[in-house]
């Protein structure tokens, strides 16, 4: 079963209303619809654009602006840091790196690249990769690409569904031709990466107060260099390590 175009348009607008960075996904969704389901694209677009116009009218009436500041492109002014540094920070840094906090996503990406010849025929394969790449590229232009006071890669949570799509697509093409020993090794690596990711994003993120205090010892918005300091990864923060940061 497929989602009715009216519902889909409403959901896409709701996604944008919640997080304006989902505009990347919305554009890709319309490209997919025009490619695969052209008959549904029109009604989906009319619904989404209609709701967007109502939002614009409401904002103009109540705030005197076409869109709230949170939605304006001025946020894409850039941080002034070199692009490779920001990319490393987004993906591998000890303070905000997506693959540092959730290595299972790195494994999924590597497996998807490994089987690209078999997976490239899957429409969701290209959609997921484009979503991940374009969203990450958008964040490279953010002034505060690390997402302010938060835990881990907050601004990259939008692309978690893209990694889920890749996982599903890869699972359908599970490499049955591999020797059993290699299949066991691959599954073991997957289990370990999932366990580490769950630990970091549940126990460390939810129940360790020190990981929240890490943002203010010192203020990470004023001392973003600590995003890259492997002596003080956020997910291993303790009262002692936070105090050590302050006294450096």
Q: Where on the chain are the PLM-derived regions?
A:
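Cytosolic-side transmembrane helix boundary signature
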Residues: 166-189
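Membrane-interfacial loop-to-transmembrane alpha-helix junctions, especially the N-terminal start
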Residues: 4, 44, 119-132, 182-190
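Hydrophobic/aromatic-rich transmembrane helices and adjacent perimembrane loops
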Residues: 18, 101-107, 149-172
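Interfacial helix-loop-helix junctions of multi-pass membrane proteins
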Residues: 139-151
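Membrane-embedded, lumen/periplasm-facing catalytic core of multi-pass transferases
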Residues: 150, 187-248
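Membrane-lumen/periplasm interface segments of specific transmembrane helices
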Residues: 36-111, 125-139, 160, 196-211
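Perimembrane helix-loop-helix junctions
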Residues: 3, 24-49, 109-120, 165, ...
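Membrane-interface alpha helices of multi-pass inner-membrane proteins
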Residues: 4-19, 26-33, 49-53, 90
